[in-house]
Amino acid sequence: ESGVYTGFIYCADPNGWGNEFKFQKVAGDWGTEINSGHMTGGITGDFADGGGNFKATAGEGVYYVTLDMANMTLDAVKVEKMGIIGDFNGWGGDVDMTWNATDYCFEATNAGVTAGGWKFRVNADWAINLGGETLDDLVANGANIGVAGSTVKLYPTRKTSDKIYCTVE
């Protein structure tokens, strides 16, 4: 209720509503909504006040959101680039991933990740990165991933699971 919540959301505008949205404290219960009017501490980054709704000012895409209920602030960073970096490429430069809007995942083929360790990072920067000891529970600033493979899919939005996870084939 008064904590800091972080996560990825996918904003699309299939109905022409201008990429506007609200959060719900309880799924399906609009009486528990959190909207832009509640953010007395401000809205920063790639979101703005959309007249009661949050508005994704950078348009359709995936965003990393930090919602601070204690200070009533919201910050959002648009994921312009999701990348994979690690031992397999000497930790130098990202393997770019593409967004698959049908499956709600970022994917890369021929990534060539190795068991030597690797991570996901947003916008070629370490400020937002994901790792983990298991593929089915990735976290911010988590441990290096130690699974080898070619095709990597990252599911960040929690649409298909309560956790952020990836698959490696």
Where are these regions (language model features)?
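Insoluble glucan recognition modules
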Residues: 1-169
